[in-house]
């Protein structure tokens, strides 16, 4: 808890360093800590409180006020996100069903750094396009066969489905700017 205060109130150079972890502020944000892990872990430069590849900055939580403590577990859990995680069956129903708004599907993995970065943009867009688009996400580790069938090769991959089912879906792969996503939703669908 004290480390969280130090990491958020002090400049990165004054923040404490844990063995195997480096603290530094992310670009374009207020000073907070980010971490990198050694020992073959997949974590590098992600925001605190995000668990990737089993690596987490010890004693530091993203936003304790926004998390709920699970008694007896010693864990804090974040509330549900705005973008719903769906299964293969749910996605099939959404794609084949009648829609009045575009459907945007985010194929991601919890261990994927660019996926975590883009998830923040997707959440913001879900609020911005609340009544004009439907955003869902698919965890490729949980839905491997669906990801394979949808030819998801790199992460994150976004699919854009128009409400007009005669139009082909659009696909992007990799971390793309939020303005590009807006442009696709506003002009291409």
Swiss-Prot record:
Site note Deprotonates C-terminal active site Cys applies to: 106
Catalytic residues, per the record, are 112 (nucleophile), 115 (nucleophile)
**Where is this protein localized, as stated in its record?**
Plastid, Chloroplast
- Per UniProt, residues of the Thioredoxin domain are 72-189
The Gene Ontology CC terms held by the record are: chloroplast
Which keywords has UniProt assigned to this entry?
Answer: Chloroplast, Disulfide bond, Electron transport, Oxidoreductase, Plastid, Redox-active center, Transit peptide, Transport
Superkingdom to which the source organism belongs: Eukaryota
Give the EC number(s) under which this enzyme is classified.
Answer: 1.8.-.-
Transit peptide where, by residue?
1-56
Q: Where is this site: Contributes to redox potential value?
A: 113-114
CDD domains cross-referenced by the UniProt entry: TRX_family (cd02947)
Entries under Gene3D superfamilies matching the protein: Glutaredoxin
Q: Name one GO biological process term.
A: cell redox homeostasis
Q: Which GO terms describe its molecular function?
A: disulfide oxidoreductase activity; protein-disulfide reductase [NAD(P)H] activity
Q: InterPro entries in the record, alphabetically?
A: CITRX (IPR044182), Thioredoxin-like_sf (IPR036249), Thioredoxin_CS (IPR017937), Thioredoxin_domain (IPR013766)
Q: Got any disulfides in this one, which pairs?
A: 112-115
Job description of the protein: Probable thiol-disulfide oxidoreductase that may play a role in proper chloroplast development.
The family classification in the record reads: Belongs to the thioredoxin family. Plant CITRX-type subfamily.
**Descriptive protein name:** Thioredoxin-like protein CITRX, chloroplastic
The upper taxonomy is: Eukaryota, Viridiplantae, Streptophyta, Embryophyta, Tracheophyta
């Amino acid at each position: 808890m004290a480390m969280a205060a130090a990491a958020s109130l002090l400049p990165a150079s004054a923040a404490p360093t844990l063995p195997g972890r480096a603290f530094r502020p992310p670009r374009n944000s207020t000073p907070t800590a980010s971490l990198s892990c050694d020992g073959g872990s997949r974590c590098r430069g992600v925001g605190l409180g995000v668990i990737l590849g089993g690596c987490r900055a010890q004693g530091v939580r993203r936003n304790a006020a926004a998390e709920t403590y699970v008694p007896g577990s010693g864990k804090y859990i974040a509330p549900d996100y705005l973008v719903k995680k769906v299964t293969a069956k749910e996605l099939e129903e959404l794609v084949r069903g009648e829609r009045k708004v575009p459907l945007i599907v985010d194929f991601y993995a919890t261990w994927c750094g660019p996926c975590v970065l883009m998830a923040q943009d997707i959440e913001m867009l879900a609020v911005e396009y609340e009544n004009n688009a439907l955003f869902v996400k698919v965890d490729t580790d949980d839905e491997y066969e669906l990801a394979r069938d949808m030819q998801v090769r790199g992460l994150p991959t976004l699919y854009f489905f128009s409400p007009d089912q005669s139009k082909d879906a659009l696909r992007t792969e990799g971390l793309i700017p939020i303005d590009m996503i807006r442009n696709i939703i506003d002009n291409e669908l």
